[in-house]
């Protein structure tokens, strides 16, 4: 896993060790440039994109006071850059998963649909079928706190043509 924050990498390492996972490596890495370094080498890429966090407000109450309206305007540009760069890492036949913990369509389906229009080599797979999430229709998974009894998340699964 890669992140620009060292404290997050330490948390990933700690959790991987506690779970007995031996195949997890962490890198201090900017996701906006990762495609240049690892282009076309990955079977699977998971993007946990930085987002407004609107899906986790009930657990992270301080977000209500820390987030600014300007965040909602600037985050999609960062998310686009990350998705663009990370997509370059996926080799033909590989899978790219884009996820956030927000309910904002501009950060979710808006980003993915725009990406898919620019990248015909990727097609969306039905994430709800692949992940066996009952009660969810369509290609994307959008978990809603009021409906699903958990934090809000968005998941899109895309496959790169061989």
Where are these regions (language model features)?
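S-adenosylmethionine
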Residues: 1-162
């Amino acid at each position: 896993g890669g992140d620009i924050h060292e404290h997050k990498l330490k948390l990933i390492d700690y959790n991987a060790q506690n779970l007995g996972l031996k195949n997890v490596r962490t890198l201090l890495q900017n996701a906006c440039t990762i495609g240049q370094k690892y282009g076309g080498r990955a079977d699977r890429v998971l993007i946990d994109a930085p987002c407004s966090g609107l899906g986790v407000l009930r657990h992270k109450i301080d977000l209500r006071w820390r987030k600014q309206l300007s965040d909602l305007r600037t985050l999609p540009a960062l998310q686009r850059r990350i998705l663009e760069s990370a997509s370059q890492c996926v080799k033909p036949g590989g899978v790219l998963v884009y996820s956030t913990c927000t309910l904002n369509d501009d950060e979710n389906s808006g980003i993915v649909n725009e990406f898919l229009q620019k990248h015909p080599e990727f097609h969306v797979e039905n994430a709800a079928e692949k992940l066996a999430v009952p009660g969810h229709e369509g290609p994307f998974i959008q978990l809603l706190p009021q409906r699903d009894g958990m934090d809000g998340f968005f998941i899109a699964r895309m496959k790169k043509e061989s």
